[in-house]
Swiss-Prot record:
It catalyses: L-rhamnopyranose = L-rhamnulose. Keywords: Cytoplasm, Isomerase, Manganese, Metal-binding, Rhamnose metabolism. Catalyzes the interconversion of L-rhamnose and L-rhamnulose. Its main location: cytoplasm. The keyword Nucleotide-binding does not apply. It comes from Shigella flexneri. It is found in: Cytoplasm. This is L-rhamnose isomerase. Mn(2+) binds at H262, D294, D296. One of its GO terms (cellular component) is cytoplasm. The gene is rhaA.
Amino acid sequence: MTTQLEQAWELAKQRFAAVGIDVEEALRQLDRLPVSMHCWQGDDVSGFENPEGSLTGGIQATGNYPGKARNASELRADLEQAMRLIPGPKRLNLHAIYLESDTPVSRDQIKPEHFKNWVEWAKANQLGLDFNPSCFSHPLSADGFTLSHPDDSIRQFWIDHCKASRRVSAYFGEQLGTPSVMNIWIPDGMKDITVDRLAPRQRLLAALDEVISEKLNPAHHIDAVESKLFGIGAESYTVGSNEFYMGYATSRQTALCLDAGHFHPTEVISDKISAAMLYVPQLLLHVSRPVRWDSDHVVLLDDETQAIASEIVRHDLFDRVHIGLDFFDASINRIAAWVIGTRNMKKALLRALLEPTAELRKLEAAGDYTARLALLEEQKSLPRQAVWEMYCQHHDTPAGSEWLESVRAYEKAILSQRG
């Protein structure tokens, strides 16, 4: 530890102590909050089932920055490089299309054995794993419907895929000793005016009930469902709307996934957390950055990211909220994208932990909104960077932008060889 960092740390401890904050306790609490990194930033959601196929489902990864991962070994190596530059606990979020097999595997036939390499890798790197069925980029999703498909056989195919995915998820949790959160998102919807909005939702309701009918150990597996406002090619009607999934998660007591990009641009998920928590047992968050639509830009340390983190901390939702990231930018170095977005999420959580929330609550309860606003703004000037740098020091990761040097070196030595 440098003398300069020691001095800054001691000063920060004193400054925060003056407003009632124990910075060492804040760092301990931050280590209770793993962030689940999404594997698909590393290869633009290509997966290993059909890497040359088109990305469908109303989502897009734009850009052609060189060096994307082409196989599981490259993707795991890239993830390791990114994780070395991110302090604190992490998880990895996998999609079903990231299976490994020497022969083609139909999605309704995926098994734990197709993900055993991921589990062994997670054990070696002390990571938890989360999971997702992949209901897109497939011939049987080409017409825009999966779990709500009017064709019984196609709908059953996707039901069976989600059932198989739940067993993979439970395998993750059993092997790694931490529950896997499995999130169901489907692209189902219509491009133009829809006459019958009810029937697809009735089919989706019945399909989901069949999917979750097998009882799994909650210590190993957690079901989550995710809504969306619209997607490309599904601008007019989305079967799995917010109201549908809020009702489903409430009535079936599953987890509810809130994705920062899946609502109207004037809506924010930070305002939805406290409302949803009154009705559902757990939340899964997909922290993202929508620019005019669900563009999945890299997460910034912006007002909404901070507001999301503050909601988790202010309401002590550590054990009920699962923090995941969901962005994929192919226009910049993909490892840097992971590092920037994940570090920003962790910085936001730390800032929330350094807030004098108890004092702010007292002011709010007393109706002293002037002092509340004044204190909220003044605490932004406290030496939070020194605390972040000490946290990075504790976890042997770069504190400032020097992490970029490591990414550039890896790019030159490894990524540039991929073409």
